[in-house]
């Protein structure tokens, strides 16, 4: 198993955060929610959003809010498939790490 704890972990977390809202959510809220889970600079997350959009995992649209446009992100079907793969890999990865931390042997 090869769970990349760098870019893939950020991608997985962002997809998980965005997928919680059926109609999508806006960039600033995504950064705040992600930062509740992991300590990452806000400036790191906007390139992640662009990468996920470019990979067709997120779709983007603008909506008026207080007289200004606010950019929203919504998970695509491809994004949901990718998130499911990340969730499966994470479950296996974290299970093995937990087993190791608890003194078990890895098979």
Predicted regions and their residues:
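Amphipathic alpha-helical dimerization/coiled-coil segments
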Residues: 84-107
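Short, hydrophobic-biased segments on the C-terminal half of alpha helices
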Residues: 46-51
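Beta-hairpin "wing" of winged helix-turn-helix
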Residues: 55-69, 74
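A general structural signal marking secondary-structure boundaries and capping sites
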Residues: 22, 56, 101-104
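N-terminal helix-turn-helix DNA-binding core of bacterial DNA-binding proteins
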Residues: 2-44
């Amino acid at each position: 198993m090869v769970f990349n704890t760098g870019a893939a972990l950020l991608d997985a977390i962002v997809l998980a955060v965005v997928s919680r809202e059926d109609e999508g959510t806006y960039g600033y809220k995504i950064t705040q929610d992600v930062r509740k889970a992991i300590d990452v600079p806000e400036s790191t997350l906007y390139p992640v959003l662009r990468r996920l959009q470019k990979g067709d995992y997120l779709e983007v649209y603008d909506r008026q809010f207080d007289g200004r446009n606010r950019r929203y992100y919504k998970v695509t079907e491809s994004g949901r498939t990718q998130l499911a793969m990340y969730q499966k890999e994470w479950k296996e990865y974290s299970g093995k790490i937990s087993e190791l931390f608890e003194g078990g042997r890895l098979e």
